[in-house]
């Protein structure tokens, strides 16, 4: 999943919005956000998992302490995508279409972009329903777009994506239409 990340750097560099790799990385890993931004991150992650587990039931996968190991790994297993989606795509679409339409377009692009991993045997996505995944993409896009709008930064979005992906190894549940729709609302 590094194509959105790489595209972000190329786009920002080409448009003179960053001078070099160091400035780009500084922009991405700016962790100085107000406490309410991080409260919002935790709130969205808790809502996502509480609803998913409550509606669908769950099994424990990896032990909870593994999050310490899993979370940094998720930076390369999903979180890095946010640099393209929330740092470039969402804000640019918002300039033309406004928040809601931009979020819907971003979620559709994000959903389609993930299609190939549904055909790779052994991935977590190989056993998922692709259309439910699309609803989940819309749900998460709204959460991530809101976090981006509130924080005006991409790091809280990266953290949210890492937490969602990382916790999926610990709290294992099957998505259902009901849980995806309720979470969306």
Show the residue positions of the predicted features.
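Hydrophobic/aromatic residues in alpha-helical transmembrane segments
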Residues: 51, 89, 140-144
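Juxtamembrane helix-entry segments on the extracytoplasmic side of multipass membrane proteins
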Residues: 59-71, 121-135
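Specific transmembrane helices
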Residues: 1-78, 149, 169-185
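Aromatic-anchored segments of alpha-helical transmembrane domains
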Residues: 45-53, 108-117, 162-170
């Amino acid at each position: 999943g590094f194509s959105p990340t790489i595209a972000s750097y190329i786009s920002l560099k080409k448009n003179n919005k960053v001078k070099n790799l160091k400035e780009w990385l500084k922009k991405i890993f700016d962790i100085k956000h107000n406490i309410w931004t991080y409260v919002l991150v935790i709130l969205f992650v808790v809502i996502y998992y509480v609803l998913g587990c409550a509606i669908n039931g769950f099994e424990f996968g990896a032990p909870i302490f593994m999050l310490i190991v899993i979370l940094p790994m998720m930076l390369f297993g999903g979180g890095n995508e946010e640099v393209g989606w929330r740092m470039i795509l969402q804000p640019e679409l918002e300039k033309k279409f406004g928040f809601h339409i931009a979020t819907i377009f971003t979620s559709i692009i994000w959903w389609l972009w993930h299609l190939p991993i549904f055909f790779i045997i052994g991935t977590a996505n190989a056993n998922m329903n692709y259309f439910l995944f699309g609803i989940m993409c819309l749900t998460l896009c709204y959460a991530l777009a809101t976090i981006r709008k509130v924080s005006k930064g991409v790091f809280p979005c990266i953290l949210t994506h890492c937490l969602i992906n990382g916790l999926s190894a610990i709290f294992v549940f099957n998505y259902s239409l009901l849980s995806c729709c309720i979470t969306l609302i």
